[in-house]
Amino acid sequence: RQMCIRDRLYTYAVNLSPAIEMGLWKGGKLTAQVVFPIAANLYGEYKKIHPGVMTLSQEVRFRNNLFGRITAGNFTHNRMGAQLDMKFRTDNGRLELGALVGATVYSAIVDSEGWYVSTTPRVNAFLKASVYEPHTNLQFDLQGGRYIYGDYGVRGDCTRHFGEYAIGLYALYTGGEINGGFHFAIPLPGKRWKRNHAFRINPADYFAWTYSMVSHGKYINDQMGKSYNIRPDENRSSNFYQPDYIRHFLIKDQEKKTK
């Protein structure tokens, strides 16, 4: 059922992907995204208007810096299902420990059947740890567990934060194979648009991209190291709320105003 891309020397896809996010109640959020293809050298879903991320999520804050979130719906990378996240954060925010478990099926628009949804769920689960070093603004992440298609692996990331910019390297070992690469997230113009009383319309806040050193062999044939996102705007900068980091830039901003 995977949309084959092995007969292409290179691939490209340009889409317009508007999304609506709506707060329903305390901690509850509805997200709906539709993908409009503009140009692509692929086929199947890449040539059709199709649903993007469509989810309903509930976040809960427990005592002692413990947070939980459950999300259900249609995710990125053609996965549909549910995911549960739990996270513990120290008072100063420099250490985070977490875990997640998800159960998803394959979901895609195909030429022969329209919207196809598989009947065999796949389970993915991870343990995570994150450490922030305030003097150099470096964030170190380590996670290990089971990916979507059954391979077990470990991934480590090192990310440097520059204001609203985030640039990092990663290394991945899964299914007996080594991979690595880099990633970045940069802010886009138009982030500070004025809010209407009821809603606001604005472009994406960030452009995020990840480069993988190895994208052939088992990483294609066996779909190793595959994961998904539960939000259309997930990146390593927009959800980075480290207290020391925020305090540092608030002080710098105040110093500029007083000069």
PLM segments and residue spans:
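Flexible, glycine-rich linker and terminal segments associated
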Residues: 1, 96, 108-109, 117-118, ...
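Short, small-residue-biased leader/transition segments that mark boundaries at the very start
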Residues: 3-5
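Feature captures outer-membrane beta-barrel proteins of Gram-negative bacteria and organelles
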Residues: 14-25, 49-62, 81-101, 123-133, ...
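Membrane-embedded beta-strand positions of outer-membrane beta-barrel proteins
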Residues: 30-34, 68-70, 97-101, 129, ...
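Hydrophobic alpha-helical bundles in membrane proteins
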Residues: 36, 54-71
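Surface-exposed loop and membrane-interface regions of Gram-negative outer-membrane beta-barrel proteins
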Residues: 38-54
